[in-house]
Structures are given as C-alpha cells and as structure tokens.
C-alpha cells in the first residue's frame, strides 16, 4: 500500500470482529518515519454493543478523502482501493518533476 501521500488516517474497529485483522494491517503498513513526518493517525476501539460501524478513512495530501468498511474486504482489496488515488498522485508528482 502506497502511504506516502496520506495526511490523515482514521481506523475504527472492534478487536474481536472480522475487520480487526484488516484494520491492524492498515495501521502496520504506515511506516514509523511517516508517522514522525506529520501523518496524523487516529485509532478507535469499538465494542460489540456499539452501533458504530468499523471504518478506515484516509485523507490524502490533496485533501481528497476516501473511506471503506474493513469488514467487507480483505487487506489486499483495501490496499488496491487506496492505491488507486495514491498512484494518481504519484504520477502527478513525477510529471511535475520533469
């Protein structure tokens, strides 16, 4: 997963739900150096009694926001979903450099 264009990541999950693995992998995919360089990361644990839905929400450096329910997809599908916009930003960045 291309994370260098993320400015903010919000992950909300039940640690005992089926979305827990995907949510933890998303958090683990963000390198520590990026966390120190200003990417805001918020994680929230929800319980079975909560009616709040699990969520992974990413805000990119160009202010675009994307969000998905991690219980409906595996990590690879989620990574591909977020990588679509990251690849567009990467291409735009490469074109600006030349």
From Swiss-Prot:
UniProt xrefs under InterPro entries:
Ribosomal_mL53, Ribosomal_mL53_fung
Q: What is its main location?
A: mitochondrion
A Gene Ontology annotation in the biological process aspect, one of them, is: mitochondrial translation
Family membership: Belongs to the mitochondrion-specific ribosomal protein mL53 family.
Pfam families, alphabetized: MRP_L53
Supply the alphabetized keyword list.
Mitochondrion, Ribonucleoprotein, Ribosomal protein
GO MF annotation list = structural constituent of ribosome
The record's subcellular locations are: Mitochondrion
Query: Subunit composition?
Result: Component of the mitochondrial large ribosomal subunit (mt-LSU). Mature yeast 74S mitochondrial ribosomes consist of a small (37S) and a large (54S) subunit. The 37S small subunit contains a 15S ribosomal RNA (15S mt-rRNA) and 34 different proteins. The 54S large subunit contains a 21S rRNA (21S mt-rRNA) and 46 different proteins.
Q: Report what the protein is called.
A: Large ribosomal subunit protein mL53
Anything further noted?
Present with 1550 molecules/cell in log phase SD medium.
- Describe the task this protein carries out: Component of the mitochondrial ribosome (mitoribosome), a dedicated translation machinery responsible for the synthesis of mitochondrial genome-encoded proteins, including at least some of the essential transmembrane subunits of the mitochondrial respiratory chain. The mitoribosomes are attached to the mitochondrial inner membrane and translation products are cotranslationally integrated into the membrane.
Query: GO CC annotations?
Result: mitochondrial inner membrane; mitochondrial large ribosomal subunit; mitochondrion
Q: Which gene encodes it?
A: MRPL44
